[in-house]
Amino acid sequence: MPDKVLDLRNRPLRDLRISVTDKCNFRCRYCMPADIFGPDFEFLPQSKLLTFEEITRLTQIFTSLGVGKIRITGGEPLMRRNLPELIRMIREVEGVQDIAMTTNGSLLSRHAQALKEAGLDRVTVSLDSLDNERFGMLNGRGYQVDSVLDGIRVAADAGLSIKINMVVQRGVNDQDILPMARYFREQGHTLRFIEFMDVGNSNGWRLDQVVPSREIVRMIHEEMPLVATEANYYGEVASRYRYEGSNQEIGLISSVTQAFCSTCTRARLSAEGKLYNCLFASSGDDLREPVRDGRTDEEIRELIRAIWERRDVRYSEERLSETPGLDKREKVEMSHIGG
């Protein structure tokens, strides 16, 4: 039986998000804007990235503390060479119940079959518009929508479970809410709408660009009636709705207007081995050094336990309460820890 570890607010450690690279082939403005992450930007050298063996070892230690769900992130995780091999290694870890991956989808058609065969269960594809011109502007590199839709089709054919994430920004892509809902309802994939968040320090976040989830629900409900659905499990971040008369669902991730800090069970491991206890964290705890310095599994396990047991973060709740000085706090970039 895995040990149970709780933070200062009695939140268990259940989910581990593992970033495998800080690189991405997109330059989305809310994550990795091109004016900051330009040609001269210095990404992590290979020597500083956790190896697959180190990631697998840490995964084993995390599962001994109660983690059952693993999500592979980036950057863009498919830019890490031989990623299916890592999936295979994690799949063999006792206690791992579910392996998912978040991707921009542009490289998915090349790798979906190998990922499925290696043991990947699910994939979440980030897609913010079906309009080619707008999508090219949003991804900052002129990628076309078809490259992502092709990846989704190949992944579905391979047998991967698929969800789509759409970050909604008022005045940027809010006109795409209904077209996205119609399209993915027809395709049979769950579409999740995410409120534009103040992650990192470089995405130019403004509160007036947030489209509240309740507004999105109202907009869709007027055309395609929705019925609220119960959560699947403790700590589920998305509020779920199904289309009336069907089992097809949408989800709403309302991290700005309806903070879910009180049930957050996620830890985040960056590509170079720092452990972050919140998406909005200012700093992380280094696990790479103890791994490479010869610490035993038990020593690293107790280090992780201590980090989680002193966890007291609730950034989104503090944002809602307008905590003084919150907007001046430095935060890790989302591209570094995978959202």
From Swiss-Prot:
Residue ranges occupied by any Radical SAM core domain in the UniProt entry: 8-227
Free-text comment on the cofactor: Binds 2 [4Fe-4S] clusters. Binds 1 [4Fe-4S] cluster coordinated with 3 cysteines and an exchangeable S-adenosyl-L-methionine and 1 [4Fe-4S] cluster coordinated with 3 cysteines and the GTP-derived substrate.
Positions with a binding annotation for GTP: R17, R71, T102, K163, R266, A267, R268
Protein's pathway: Cofactor biosynthesis; molybdopterin biosynthesis
Binding site for S-adenosyl-L-methionine: Y30, G75, S126, M197
Biological process according to GO: Mo-molybdopterin cofactor biosynthetic process
Binding site for [4Fe-4S] cluster 1: C24, C28, C31
The EC number(s) this enzyme carries: 4.1.99.22
GO molecular function, one term: metal ion binding
Segment forming the signal sequence: none
Subunit and interaction comment: Monomer and homodimer.
Function: Catalyzes the cyclization of GTP to (8S)-3',8-cyclo-7,8-dihydroguanosine 5'-triphosphate.
Family membership noted in the UniProt record: Belongs to the radical SAM superfamily. MoaA family.
Protein known as: GTP 3',8-cyclase
Naturally occurring in which organism (per UniProt): Brevibacillus brevis (strain 47 / JCM 6285 / NBRC 100599)
